[in-house]
Amino acid sequence: MSMIDLAFIIQRPPYKSETSTLGLTHAISYQVVDMFLDDGQGVIPKVCFIGEGVFNCISEHKSMENYGVTSIESHVKNSLLVDLDMYVCKEDIDRFGIPENRLVDAEDMGADKKLQIVPFSEIQNILNNSKHIFIF
Amino acid sequence: MKLGVFVNEFKTVVETVDRLTAEKLGLIFIQNGVFHATIKENGKSSPLLDKTANFYVLAEDLATRGLTDADVDNRVKVVNYGDVVDLIFNDYEKIVWL
């Protein structure tokens, strides 16, 4: 089976623009892309939050209450629920003083996957091994 | 001049704000500007908070991003939309948006 690795890099903070949301919805769409591929082909998306993009991963968003829009937290949780591999740059959450226990977790929705906190070197490896890289 | 400045970005506005002077300066952190009031990069508060100014942060934009009053630097006052309207009409002669 021929699988293609895709890297989605989210580097913009949440909500002021649609950028972060677009990155996540594009990544989630991997579930339906099979219909456009030949038999035996598939894609493996990986989502990486770096820089100010790690702000998207702080939990307890109240965007529906305040903006009337689906929260980025919901998109992250749904991504975990469909078994997307998602990575958060450890250097960046440390730099911004974001404790790991403040990050989004989809365990309450029954997701097996969790946000994986990794050093940037691991994200660099993901970039190196991906056929296509999408920056949001 | 009494100048109120809406700060709605985290990284890109620091230099501009740093150059602004006014008889009375108010920095109102909204949208992604709220991270100036909450994030300590490498253990240090935003350099904007070192300015001589009054600082405000919009509660609704904090909550949207999963942040609470407890995350806010003690130099910054948490305000709601109604308070911001009062600031615009009562406290500042000119308002700019960065």
Language model regions located:
Chain A
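Short, glycine-rich nucleotide/cofactor-binding loops
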Residues: 8-25, 57-66
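Short internal beta-strands
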Residues: 44-53, 84-92
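Low-complexity intrinsically disordered segments
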Residues: 93-94, 108-131
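Histidine-anchored nucleotide/phosphate-binding helix
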Residues: 20-42, 47
